[in-house]
């Protein structure tokens, strides 16, 4: 019997408990101290601009090899200093806000802010992009070791004048759970964009049907108009994608584009939210606005939906 986790993210008592912890005098005192420390690591953009102008004027007056050496040294040490401040800011944010919340729900959760989920997972969800960037890699303390990451996928093209243009194909979140599905090959459920390309369904960079895949339709007209199923395993596709999964995916499409990829080893979902979650605060005002319960709400709905998906699939296998 597989353990189910969906209720952990729909239970109002957990939200209530997090707010109680946050509002306790001890936690308020701790958060006040933490926020003051984080503010010390915020670099004022105005100071950066003034400093850059001053250095430029001073070096321009010299215009010799020594000025170039000084400029190189300044850039090197400034980058090193900025990176150190950013790392300290990230550690404070992770330890005192993200982990403080997530460990209340799944105690063994870990976070590496400057890493991303496995590149293969990203490529299989958005296969027609060229480059992939991500951050905030979270490994949740559940039986599946569910992984989370922000993700951006983009392509680069060159115009007739030789100028490079970057196009963002996807911006949002990716979730992946290791799961022995018994699938022979893989199953892809990709969103359909409005309009057709050369008379064919437009999937954007989610990838069209390949030669080894078979297109499968469901009894839901709403689903068939919003998603395409491409699979190498007809039996498990029809077994897994039952009315509960269809309903769940239909609900998601009202909020954002969602893509599902499954193979014999894992289940993954991408949410095209057009924004990164858990961005580091850039100003002192943003630091003041940080809240345990607010950080939890940012990811709660996506985790609830993802664990619902896993629970339903687990019942079938």
What does each model-found stretch correspond to?
Residues 29-37, 60-63, 84, 88:
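Membrane-helix interfacial "entry" motifs
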Residues 54, 58, 77-80:
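Hydrophobic membrane-targeting alpha-helices
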Residues 35-54:
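Transmembrane alpha-helical segments and their cytosolic interface motifs
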Residues 56-73:
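Hydrophobic alpha-helical transmembrane segments
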